[in-house]
Regions:
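Glycine-rich FAD pyrophosphate-binding loop
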Residues: 23-45
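N-terminal Rossmann-like FAD-binding beta1-loop-alpha1 element of flavoenzymes
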Residues: 3-31
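Flavin (FAD/FMN) cofactor-binding and adjacent substrate-gating region
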Residues: 70-162
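Short beta-strand to alpha-helix junction loop
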Residues: 59-68, 137-153, 264-269, 336-337
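N-terminal glycine-rich dinucleotide-binding loop that anchors FAD/FMN and/or NAD(P) in oxidoreductases
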Residues: 44-70
């Protein structure tokens, strides 16, 4: 049975869902979104991501990230045009951060992480390699994604597969049914609106909330990714740095401010972020401190967090149109993108099979 599918949202979750669905030629797909790759708006989270693979799920919920790692690793090795490269990653933990109540994710700093068998070269660092003030550290090879290249690359893959993209704003998810480029009513809607699901009519998921993240993009380079579990500047701040592929600059961060909707960068916060980075990695600025950082831009985006975790499931609307939700990924949208999109495809296939059986 052929499906006419409308995907709402052109962040990494929506685009990846559309990509995997487009590999089945029975699906005719239209992506409709308020924001498209190339836009910079705080409510459009995907361009502001680092983006990298730093596992955040619990062991029981790790399958999405495991499946995504395999694909991102393949793209890094085989498809340089995707804008992904390998980079060594160091994770430094302070025991007091792990036990305190803060918005900073705790999963990456587990002393016995589930993902140690996902990375071939995972190792605990000797104490003399641990940053001062930290209690332990680990190291492994991860990937960093230049989102300014990767998101347009995804769009290119969609166009090659016959997917149509168009801008549009909907106030209610039911409106998506009439937005297919074919002119036919959609038989399936994929809701990948992220934080938009908080206000979207027909969804209005009050479990959604923003976690503001402020970063600085600089021309300086870091020779490896760095993550530190916390700071002395407040429970909602951490230290991280990574190099985007293909001249994308280094991302310096950052903050995890739950419930904060403000997308304007704060100069005081920016100074704290830069000061912390040059303190633990003075080499990034040539030993010149903050003055040695060549700033490209300051930015703040809203991570789409959800109480109870990501929502990846089907729902029937009152007119019996099926909606498949794929939103609420918080700060792990990229590193869970292919796993979640695979789940979307599996749900769509089950819906299709159910309709076929019903007609027999």
């Amino acid at each position: 049975m052929n499906e006419t599918i409308v995907v709402l949202g052109a962040g990494v979750s929506g685009l990846t869902s559309a990509l995997l669905l487009s590999r089945d030629k029975r699906n005719t797909i239209t992506v409709v979104a308020k924001h498209m790759p190339g836009d910079l708006d705080g409510e459009y989270a995907s361009p502001f991501a680092g983006a990298n693979v730093m596992p955040m799920a619990t062991s029981d919920e790790s399958q999405w990230e495991r499946e995504t790692w395999a694909e991102l690793k393949r793209l890094c090795q085989e498809v340089p045009a995707s804008g992904i490269h390998f980079q060594k990653c160091q994770v430094h933990r302070r025991n007091k951060d792990i036990s305190m109540n803060s918005d900073v994710p705790k999963g990456p700093f587990d002393t016995n992480p589930w993902f140690k068998d996902m990375f071939d070269d995972f190792r605990e660092l000797p104490q003399d390699k641990v940053l001062p003030g930290c209690d332990g550290a680990s190291e492994f090879t991860s990937v960093c994604i230049n989102t300014a290249i990767y998101l347009p690359w995804l769009v290119g893959q969609l166009l090659e597969n016959g997917v149509q993209l168009k801008r549009g704003v909907v106030s209610d998810i039911r409106e998506a049914k009439r937005l297919s480029h074919t002119g036919r009513p959609a038989t399936l809607i994929i809701n990948a609106t992220g934080l938009g699901s908080y206000k979207l009519g027909g969804v209005k998921d009050t479990n959604m909330y923003p976690a503001r993240g402020q970063v600085i993009v600089v021309r300086n380079e870091v020779d490896s990714m760095l993550f530190v579990s916390g700071t002395e500047d407040g429970a909602n701040e951490a230290v991280y740095a990574m190099n985007r592929a293909a001249g994308g600059g280094a991302i310096l961060g950052g903050t995890f401010e739950a419930g904060t909707w403000d997308t304007q960068p704060d100069p005081t916060t920016a100074l704290r972020i830069m000061s912390r980075i040059v303190k633990v990695r003075p080499d990034i600025a040539g030993g010149e401190g903050v003055a040695g950082l060549s700033v490209v831009r300051h930015a703040a985006g809203l991570r789409p967090y959800r109480h109870g975790g990501a929502r990846v499931e089907a729902e029937k609307m009152d007119d019996m149109t099926t909606v498949v939700h794929n939103y609420g990924h918080g700060g792990w949208g990229y590193q869970g993108s292919y796993g979640c999109a695979k789940s979307v495809v599996e749900i769509v296939d089950k819906v299709r099979e159910g309709r076929t059986r019903a007609k027999l």
